[in-house]
Amino acid sequence: MKAIIVLLMVVTSNADRICTGITSSNSPHVVKTATQGEVNVTGVIPLTTTPTKSHFANLKGTKTRGKLCPNCLNCTDLDVALARPMCVGTTPSAKASILHEVRPVTSGCFPIMHDRTKIRQLPNLLRGYENIRLSTQNVINAERAPGGPYRLGTSGSCPNVTSRDGFFATMAWAVPRDNKTATNPLTVEVPYICTKGEDQITVWGFHSDNKTQMKNLYGDSNPQKFTSSANGVTTHYVSQIGGFPNQTEDGGLPQSGRIVVDYMVQKPGKTGTIVYQRGVLLPQKVWCASGRSKVIKGSLPLIGEADCLHAKYGGLNKSKPYYTGEHAKAIGNCPIWVKTPLKLANGTKYRPPAKLLKER
């Protein structure tokens, strides 16, 4: 019987390699993993963005406050907070507020010695409330306050709506009418007059001048003592007589004297007290404030709308869940800050093409 021999032959082409797996090109995508370090993958989805600085904006779906009184033209927030004539208007409610005046300029009404008190904080205190309104009535009758009767002083730098001399609506400058003599400390009680259970912010202060003016106005050229007390907080002051710092930036008419302005916060139903001598600025209209508004440092104007307000970048729309760059306070629907970019691998781990078998 003849044997049948079958020969298996390998037929080769000009190439000496064949591919034994799926062909794959080199991958440019590298991700860091917790267990394997840097790994090449076939595809990624970026999860981070690096914002660029832009205008601040209104927070989407939320009332945003820029200036305390948007319709009060040529008025700083400090003017509005003190109710300077021509700077009294509607203060809209807001869930978010922009702190845009880090150092409010001095009101042109009268030179204020800012560094003696916390008065610079007043606009920001008001900005931190959702609802703020100025009372329609005065908290006390200043003309008949203890130590009076008083006439109410005005300033040519504070023209009112009729272009006559005026003064801040939150305070009454109590100048003795006839009894221009020194006085022992006097006490006035400041009642709570807000009607909706709000915090009551009561503004008060005192005027001081050189010895000649103090004698002419008040009959006493000595330093005067003042104390305020409310909500468990007591503050003491002694007035300065002359030797005031130059405040040419104040604007308005030149003034030989200065005023010191402060405020106290009265909780619902609580009475405050002010102990004073000559030159007192007695409280008049008060701020009634309620709710909370988130505050972020920024700049005006507010342009358009944004998902997020960021202290460094302004208004941001959330295109990615994370961001890199400068880390700062942000409010709203904001991406989360991360130190380095994050990527989501949406492909497979890159495997180089398998080595091809050579012909033996």
Swiss-Prot record:
Cysteine disulfide links: none
Compartments where located: Virion membrane; Host apical cell membrane
Post-translational modification (record): In natural infection, inactive HA is matured into HA1 and HA2 outside the cell by one or more trypsin-like, arginine-specific endoprotease secreted by the bronchial epithelial cells. One identified protease that may be involved in this process is secreted in lungs by club cells. Palmitoylated.
Signal peptide residue numbers: 1-15
GO biological process: fusion of virus membrane with host endosome membrane; fusion of virus membrane with host plasma membrane; symbiont entry into host cell; virion attachment to host cell
Membrane topology: Single-pass type I membrane protein
Keyword annotations of the record: Disulfide bond, Fusion of virus membrane with host endosomal membrane, Fusion of virus membrane with host membrane, Glycoprotein, Hemagglutinin, Host cell membrane, Host membrane, Host-virus interaction, Lipoprotein, Membrane, Palmitate, Signal, Transmembrane, Viral attachment to host cell, Viral envelope protein, Viral penetration into host cytoplasm, Virion, Virus entry into host cell
UniProt similarity note: Belongs to the influenza viruses hemagglutinin family.
Protein name from the UniProt record: Hemagglutinin
Organism: Influenza B virus (strain B/Panama/45/1990)
